[in-house]
Amino acid sequence: MNFIVYPALDIRNGAVVRLQQGDYARQTRYDDQVLPRALAFADSGATWMHLVDLDAAKAGGYTLAPLLRQMTRATGLQVQTGGGVRSRDDVARILDAGAARVVIGSLAVRESARVIEWLQAFGPERITVALDTRQDAGGVWRLPVHGWTEVAEATLDVLAQQYAAAGLRHLLCTDIARDGMLSGPNMDVYTYLRALVPAVQLQVSGGARDVADVVAAKMAGCAGIVLGKALLEGRLALKEAVQQGSVADPSDPLPCGELTEPVCR
């Protein structure tokens, strides 16, 4: 299994932004250089990227299809993208616009039966289910919905197993407490999921801050990591992240001299 580093761009009103813990009122705007940033991702060695339509995530109706077409043609990157996916037609339109995978988040929690139908219709390589989670006082991983203001009845473990049984291949999981905080991913939740649904390829999301976090995700057996704020703020060099993601394979260990310090601790 190749480990994939997904540089991420969240788009709102045509600009690259980041939300802190998913809060639209706590937004940092960077610039409107969306295509140049994607080209820079490709130049740094990335083969995939993660693209989010924040306008659609709030109001529905994916708006980035023209940009997606331009981006895939100009960069050669494979793109997983989502935001506001509400119907099977939405999935089809986004795939037709050039997406390699469509990311489905809120609906995957609220209407899992529908999303499983789409998974089976389009195939497991074309869908990424994204589950945002928060651990409650009792240690249970809950699934907040509706802008994280309500909590779904289903828990993370139940829903992950349901999707795994239906053939899901790609699961992106975000610990809400770490999202946009540059405090490091909560590897406990990913270790838990790896044991629970070992056949699913797991993507780490939320809190990544440096190359050591990339290596930690790889060494934990995850399939990839989404990098957002750390890249935008220059705390992490994408080229180094891609290189480290490719060498830190626990099934093919290299001598310590061939790895950087975080792996050889």
Swiss-Prot record:
It is found in: Cytoplasm. It is an enzyme of class 5 (isomerase). Signal peptide: none annotated. InterPro entries: Aldolase_TIM, His_biosynth, HisA_bact_arch, Isoase_HisA-like, Isoase_HisA-like_bact, RibuloseP-bd_barrel. Keywords: Amino-acid biosynthesis, Cytoplasm, Histidine biosynthesis, Isomerase. It catalyses: 1-(5-phospho-beta-D-ribosyl)-5-[(5-phospho-beta-D-ribosylamino)methylideneamino]imidazole-4-carboxamide = 5-[(5-phospho-1-deoxy-D-ribulos-1-ylimino)methylamino]-1-(5-phospho-beta-D-ribosyl)imidazole-4-carboxamide. One of its GO terms (biological process) is L-tryptophan biosynthetic process. GO terms for molecular function: 1-(5-phosphoribosyl)-5-[(5-phosphoribosylamino)methylideneamino]imidazole-4-carboxamide isomerase activity. The active site is at D10, D132. Pathway: Amino-acid biosynthesis; L-histidine biosynthesis; L-histidine from 5-phospho-alpha-D-ribose 1-diphosphate: step 4/9. Its EC number is 5.3.1.16. GO terms for cellular component: cytoplasm. It holds the Pfam family His_biosynth. Belongs to the HisA/HisF family. NCBIfam families: 1-(5-phosphoribosyl)-5-[(5-phosphoribosylamino)methylideneamino]imidazole-4-carboxamide isomerase (TIGR00007). This is 1-(5-phosphoribosyl)-5-[(5-phosphoribosylamino)methylideneamino] imidazole-4-carboxamide isomerase. It comes from Xylella fastidiosa (strain 9a5c). The lineage of its organism: Bacteria, Pseudomonadati, Pseudomonadota, Gammaproteobacteria, Lysobacterales.
